[in-house]
């Protein structure tokens, strides 16, 4: 009986240590320590930068029942869903709303421009619609990684950078990105309460 208890104890310790070793690694860096995150009442979401992993593309090509490839629009939907679940205290603006407002105000449809030109016009006009904006970037190499850079809309000053690196077992799917975004919004909320 004693040996059985010892074996189960060792097994439990081993399982907890394995899950900790493969857990996602996250880091937030405040670029401007003087900026008060409580000043953010409206946060605009810029179109996420995302490219499917080679493994996802290969699966889609070879397997008939493979999951659908993720698109930036799908990621934007997840961002809004997660923000609603986490009950964030600020208003979120979608990239489509901001782009539509910029098109009406300037007469320029930035979706027809190159990324560089579109971002320049976006940065020039975002101050009219939001207090800050966030640019999400997703990388899919050997590990799934999400970056979120938050900028002040008034002067495009870099406020903070958030990075989360998935563990070895994380895959290129919406469930993982949803988990990453929950962590991002919770971290942003905690930082704003400091």
Feature locations, PLM:
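N-terminal segment of the mature soluble domain
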Residues: 54-118
């Amino acid at each position: 009986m004693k040996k059985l208890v010892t074996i189960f104890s060792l097994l439990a310790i081993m399982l907890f240590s394995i899950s900790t070793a493969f857990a996602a690694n996250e880091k937030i860096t405040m670029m401007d320590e003087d900026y008060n995150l409580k000043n953010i009442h409206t946060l605009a979401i810029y179109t996420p930068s995302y490219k499917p992993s080679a493994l996802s593309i290969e699966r889609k090509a070879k397997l008939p029942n493979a999951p659908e490839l993720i698109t930036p629009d799908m990621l934007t939907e997840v961002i809004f869903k997660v923000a609603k679940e986490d009950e964030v205290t600020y208003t979120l603006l979608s990239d489509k709303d901001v782009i539509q407002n910029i098109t009406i105000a300037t007469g320029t449809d930035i979706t027809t421009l190159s990324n560089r030109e579109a971002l320049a016009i976006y940065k020039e006009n975002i101050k009219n619609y939001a207090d800050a904006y966030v640019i999400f970037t997703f990388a899919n190499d050997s590990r799934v990684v999400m970056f979120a850079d938050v900028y002040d809309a008034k002067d495009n000053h870099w406020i903070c950078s958030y990075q989360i690196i998935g563990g070895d077992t994380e895959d290129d799917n919406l469930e993982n990105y949803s988990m990453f975004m929950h962590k991002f919004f919770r971290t942003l909320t905690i930082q704003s309460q400091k």
